[in-house]
Amino acid sequence: MNEIFRPTVDGMARMGRPFRGVLYFGLMITKDGPKVIEYNARFGDPETQAVLPRLKTDLVEIMNAIIDERLDQIQIEWTDHAACCVVLASGGYPKSYRKGHEISGISDAEAMENVLVFHAGTKLREGSDTVETAGGR
């Protein structure tokens, strides 16, 4: 926090560009400590799929508090649940990946308690309920 996040945000403010919003830090942990590989002014993908379902406070309320500079006046609450995000990638990703291959086990996962399945790079096979690969991940 004090090595990367705070200096970045403080530096933006000193340059006359105070940041308000979501700032995602893509980090790599090295033998010399954490290194920034990217900044994004958005939520991280796929990390957000694990984080937002745990949020009890209305996200719009949080965003409005950020805009109005009153974030310190609201209480942000989270569930006590653990969260995990698993990303599946089609064979060959990120280079030449396969499309049109059936993905099995999705309905079994969706039937499990407290499990959410998010799709990206998938589609329903025409005329059926079969989910197939349509993108890299």
Task: State where each predicted segment sits.
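Short acidic-glycine loop/turn motifs at beta-strand connectors
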Residues: I29-G33, E126
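A short pocket-lining beta-strand/turn micro-motif at the edge of beta-sheets
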Residues: E113-L116, G135-R137
